[in-house]
Amino acid sequence: MGRDVAVFGAYGHTGRFVVAELRERGYVPLLLGRDEARLAELAGAGFEARRASVDDPGSLDRALRGASALINCAGPFAVTAAPLVEAALRAGVPYVDVAAEIEANADMFAHFAERARAAGTVVVPAMAFFGGLGDLLVTAAMGDWTAADEAHVAYGLSGWQPTLGTLVSGEVSGRRREGRRVRFTGGRLEYHDDALPTLEWPFPDPVGPQSVIGEFTMADVVTVPSHLDVPEVRTYMSAKAASDLAAPVNGERGRSAETFVVDVRVRSGGAERRAVATGRDIYAVSAPLAVEAVDRVLTGRTRTIGVASAGAVFDAPDFLRALSAHLSLEGV
């Protein structure tokens, strides 16, 4: 098994965490991106840098030579994901990204499922805090249930200082849906113009009850129903964190002191099952999620091939427990 893992967008905020995590896990990060100056800055720390652009397939092919896997950390994923998946398929290597964009993740399943399966490779979109972690928690909470009526994923963030990449990706998604909102109900994605409700969510102690925005839809509405029979998938965001999205963007920074709790409830008939994860810094925790995914793919610890969400391709409880250095878990 090769140890070289290409990271596209390596010099971005999440990308830097991914590079550090790869190195911590004994992998050799190959730094990919189109900004030569920023690549050179990271390469000065002893990494190999390869300039590549999603507009130039040849540059991507050259950049992936010798790589065992590709992690895409560069948004907007509506722009970067497809060219990079194409390059990964040509190179015959697995692809993992940290996309939170709902439409970009849906595109992965719609456009690449058959080709990735035919190639015998694995494409894992949304392998990050939004989309990946929630899917793993829902899958773990389901346990031996083969179906459920509803899955609820509530995000309790102490704050949310968005990166520039988060804001740009959000703008791209907003334009794609023409400013409308999206939810997963009745077994399908539905676009609407309804006002978002505010309600109280009973997060576990020590967080306790908090005001949340209902139907604050995240990538879980793509990942969860991609493999689980759950016709209603609803996500919620703490009202304070939602208001922070309008705050000025910080520059490059280290690990944030902001904390999070992800509270998952799965309901079937009159029964409810719950799984909870708590931790610190939603961007930093995306790195061990993505790198653990790559490690499991490269070591053959997968359950399927093709385009698959975290909960579909990995043993969800085992995966979550492997991140005990980064997450505190309940009900897993």
Predicted regions and their residues:
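Structural motif
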Residues: 4, 68-69, 94, 273
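N-terminal Rossmann NAD(P)H-binding glycine-rich loop of SDR-like oxidoreductase domains
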Residues: 5-25
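Active-site-lining helix/loop region of Rossmann-like oxidoreductase modules
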Residues: 8, 143-274, 284
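Conserved beta-strand positions in the Rossmann-like core of class I SAM-dependent methyltransferases
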Residues: 30-31, 96
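N-terminal Rossmann-fold cofactor-binding loop
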Residues: 32-36, 53-54
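Conserved Rossmann-fold cofactor-binding substructure of NAD(P)-dependent oxidoreductases
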Residues: 51-67, 73-79
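Glycine-/Pro-rich loop/turn segments that contact NAD(P) or position catalytic residues
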Residues: 77-180
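C-terminal active-site/capping subdomain that shapes the small-molecule cofactor and substrate pocket
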Residues: 241-332
